[in-house]
Amino acid sequence: MRSIAAFAGVTQNLALVIYTKPGCPYCQQARDHYNSKGIPFIDYDAQNDKKRRAEMFSYSDGDPTVPCIVENGKYLGSGWGDPPKG
């Protein structure tokens, strides 16, 4: 399963959003995890998209760590080890 398409202004309506940066191995682990579970998500580039970076900071209270996981508009955590519980 692939991540669903990114549409501006709909982050609040999506069940799962992952803020990432290109080349981040932890971000890829998060993507692989959710894909393996068949859980649709949207993947935003928080490194190159200033709007998405600001959005990520609003959820994470300024924490720049990626991946930043948001589910149903609720911040679950940043970084990747075990999948966050939501």
What residue ranges belong to the model's regions?
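Short secondary-structure boundary/capping segments
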Residues: 8-10, 58, 67
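Thioredoxin-like thiol-disulfide oxidoreductase module
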Residues: 45-63
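Non-catalytic, surface beta->alpha helical segment in thiol-disulfide oxidoreductase systems
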Residues: 71-86
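Local sequence-structure signature of Cys/Sec-based thiol-disulfide redox active-site neighborhoods
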Residues: 3-42
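Residues at the C-termini of beta-strands that transition into short coil/loop
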Residues: 22, 45, 79
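Glycine-/small-residue-rich active-site loops that bind phosphorylated ligands and cofactors
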Residues: 25, 48, 76
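Structural micro-motif
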Residues: 60-70, 80
